[in-house]
Amino acid sequence: MNKFFYSLSLLLFFFLCEELRADTVITEIRTEQLVAPVGIDAPAPRLSWQITSTERNVMQTGYHILVSSSPEKLNKNEGDLWDSGKVQSEDSQWVPYAGKQLKSNMRCYWKVKSYTTAGETPWSTSSMWTMGLLSENRWKGVWIGMDKAFEWDSETQWSRLSARYLRKEFMVGKPVKQATIHIAGLGLYELFINGQRVGEQVLAPVPTDYRKTILYNSFDVTSLLTQNKNAIGVTLGNGRFYTMRQNYKPYKIANFGYPKMRLNLIVEYEDGSSETIASDLSWKLTADGPIRSNNEYDGEEYDARKEMDGWNKIGYDDASWLPVQRVSVPTGTLRASMTPNMKVVDRITPVAIHKIGEKYILDMGQNMAGWIRMKIKGAAGDSIRLRFAELLQPDGELYMDNLRDARVTDTYICRGIEKETTWAPRFVYHGFRYVEVTGYPSPELTDFTGEVVSDEM
């Protein structure tokens, strides 16, 4: 009988231990404080995690990290890149990778478990990171663009420069294992593969002092490629590279040149081979598209009559487009953007609308940074204008004095065939609560949405 109770007690002890293990777990897995980042250029990325427990005063006393070159190896607990073994340490933030030397474009898979005052945790869920291109000599191709303005542009104080559209078609002839694209688009860019927009980021890349640093973004685009012909499309906006004020206080406002791009798409095949589709002189460019002007101070002008249906898909006729130019290399060092991107984080409906003369004033109910997305109504050639302000004057008009010479006006010119179409600017943002609407037929609150923009932190 005593042996029976002894065995029962032992089983109960192990059961309680397992319950404890299940109640103390690893969460918030981060690499360089980012969630599964694609494209980092830290040679020894720093790893972080948190311990979550239902018990109080549970403290870490050690950790064990595994980093593998494939998910399969990680699932087998094979840390072929780094097996830290048990490390006696309370550290769970900014723990530097200390394994084999990492290479450009390498994918790394990792997990961690902790030893605590309450026992050993289970392994964390798996995470990963992808290395960027670790130096500029790892990039193929050249910087491309067009170092001139066009006849419809204006380089006066209130500069107007249309967006540049670039495209290239290429063939993928074998089954793809994985594909990663690295892009530096100055001043701002939107990226498309086979007509699909890549990523949720807006106003990318993060602005820098371009004399010192140029940032690039990286994306896993494996699922967007087909084993056949493919197309890459890139739209370049001005951002703060081609500055908002030309030939105006040059001692204060630096201008860095016309928009330009460098891009590497690295395709790795199932048979172990790889190839890089790079920005080179085989690309085509036009600036005669719908974004006629984009200026952070003055707003964006979009002429839908200039839309180029299917320009970022295979088979588009680009015979009228220009060959790109090889343009000068920016002076700043090309680095991975290891910071959360800007994105639309909230959407709000205006709380009121009232008419003043032939105009309408929208009240968003709060100050916000971002833009208005609106439903399109109108005949071909109709012009809809949105002007932005943070305050109203006593007579209900916008208060604009604090904006000095900024025009803060987004303009949409109708194509006339829009049905259930919405539009928002791509390459500008505004700080505002009130919006003056001109040229919009019978506006209602539900015709407009405020898209609030912030970083992903």
Predicted regions and their residues:
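Bacterial Sec-dependent N-terminal signal peptides
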Residues: M1-V25
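Extracellular/oxidizing-compartment recognition motifs
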Residues: T24-R107, K111-M457
